[in-house]
């Protein structure tokens, strides 16, 4: 642990300890780089000052896991990498841990010709329809049962708290989000408007907006009173690409189904 930590090494600094706590401030000087290794955890209870921009603070990710940061400072620029495990063409749920990552021209958007080994697929779920809406569907015609992307996702950036469905033609790529880290309360409006399929009414795709895991079993830190009560708790569904099916975890349960844990 450290009281204060200042990154001023010309070669950069890499944090490799499993759990590190900085009890006061972290400062990253201009032109310097501070990396948190994959599967390592950093907590900063004071202020983070990053003069190195997105490239100066990097959270790594690989097959071992993803770096975690718990902090309280607003608008910290950083690059958060995400290792995508599984086979080519598997589907994954994801969300952005930064507030200002532009979707277009990022490593997450559809590119190339689907099926040639270079393409990506990106969708959002539209509960009122209900249907999956493709990022490349920018047709000027948008109907109630077949909305286009600009209708359901009018912003250019990933939306904090919104979940996305993602597939890639490569095996185990590492993509990244770059921008200001989300911090504090994040609100995302949910809907219960679907009339076309009663089995899907009220299902919304929500994502973890932070650069650290969140615990579905935690009794505080949430506002979930508008969710459907299930045995006194709340159910969440997560897609498991290894089994090609959803798993369910109830906030009062000790285990989930289909390999799903309580950590998002």
Regions found by a protein language model. Name each.
Residues 1-17, 21-264:
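N-terminal exported-region signature
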